[in-house]
Amino acid sequence: MAVRVYLKQAWNLMKQNPLFSTLYIVGTGISIVMTMVIAIVYYVRLAPVYPETNRMRTLVVKSAKMTNDESTHSANISYAMLKDWFYSLESAEVSTGVFGTSYARVTNDKEEIPTYARYTDENFFRVFPLVFLEGKPFTEADRRSGIHNVVLTDSYAQQLFGTTKGVVGKNFLMDYTNVKVVGVVKSGSFLTPDSYAQVYLPYSCREGYDDEGSHWALGGYRVYILMKESKSVTDVQDEVLELIRKFNVSDMGDGWKLDLVGQPELYWHSTFRLWSNVAVDWGRVIWMFVGIFMVLLFVPAFNLSGMISARMERQLPDLGIRKAFGASRRRLLVQIIWENLLLTGLGTLLGLVIAWIVLALSGYEIFSLFEVFPKFPPKGVNLGMGIDMFFAPLIFVAAALFCLLLNLISALIPAWNALRHPIVESLNEQK
């Protein structure tokens, strides 16, 4: 009941001071816009969003490093390591290898259409559970025999055939090679770069997929490991470290030492890795977020605090009268905080809506601002954000917490200082 009274009084005060209220709401909204844009960008990068819904159980190996007394070589993982080590990990539910992506030319009856293709294996669709609208994944037998059976996204099937229905079994030319459609999946977004493609096909369709390089461990694959629910990250890492130890004491290395530089690592860890052969500098990452938090929270809080202090000076006579009639300092403080919480809440809603509009209109450009080495999306790829990215419960929780913190920091100190004035001094402010 008291909260209802406080909010009613806050609404009346807001109508009595439209200029102050407008400036306060807009100031809060601007701060929330910047905060929510960053929050949503990192949510899309780190949280389990379609089709990368297994991110919390996914470990990544992007590269390996081979070192001897004279030099160091780094590259992606070799086919031999993928086949002999990662496919048979006991702590993994399943592992998948990706032999890169490429831009290919697809020919239908009318024209050539560029495509973004991903070369992988049948396990890919278990690590990244794309929703099949029609058909099924290509099989292990397809991969082993190099059969050109492919999976299309629904958006690309629409572009290629003019429909998403009944395309399984159809053939088309991809880089002048005949391929057959065995499945159609719900399209993801280029904003999830580890899983996105328009066409998925076995890596054995690509020339040189099993080539042996100058070093046994180095090649062209990235590995994604879906660990068993009963296992931990440490279990997977220990199993891989034991394989590395055995390799380094054997004759296979021929004087070279293998190092995976802290990998396998959790998916969200891997997103902060700048260089494939250098471990993540967590000190730099932490200070980066501390700096962002300080700028986005405390700078607007100090500005709003100044506005509230000025208003508190004008309200001293009113506060003095309330105290004279028995209102406690605590009750008045709670009331002032609720008054400002209403304004902060309205600013938060305004900022959240503007943040959604900014992200919807800017597309990939706003996401590329947070990449050290941004990728340039090829023509025709899906850059859209799914509903699970826009309206995630965690985003609303973050907005609410930021709103509460901003309100407390900006309102608490000026309100407390104003309420410390003696009753007589507060009443004299009216003269």
Each model region followed by its residue ranges:
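Membrane-helix entry/capping segments
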Residues: 1-5, 12, 16, 247-291, ...
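C-terminal membrane-exit region of the final transmembrane helix in multipass inner-membrane proteins
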Residues: 6, 389-431
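Intracellular coupling helices
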Residues: 7-19, 302-343, 417-429
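Hydrophobic alpha-helical transmembrane segments of multi-pass inner-membrane transport and secretion
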Residues: 16-46, 278-317, 345, 405-406
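Transmembrane alpha-helical interface segments in multi-pass membrane proteins
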Residues: 19-23, 27-31, 317-363, 398, ...
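Structured, solvent-exposed hinge/loop segments at the ends of secondary-structure elements
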Residues: 39-166, 173-179, 368-381
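Membrane-interfacial segments
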Residues: 42-53, 317, 358, 362-374, ...
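Mid-to-C-terminal secondary-structure elements
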Residues: 123-137, 150-277
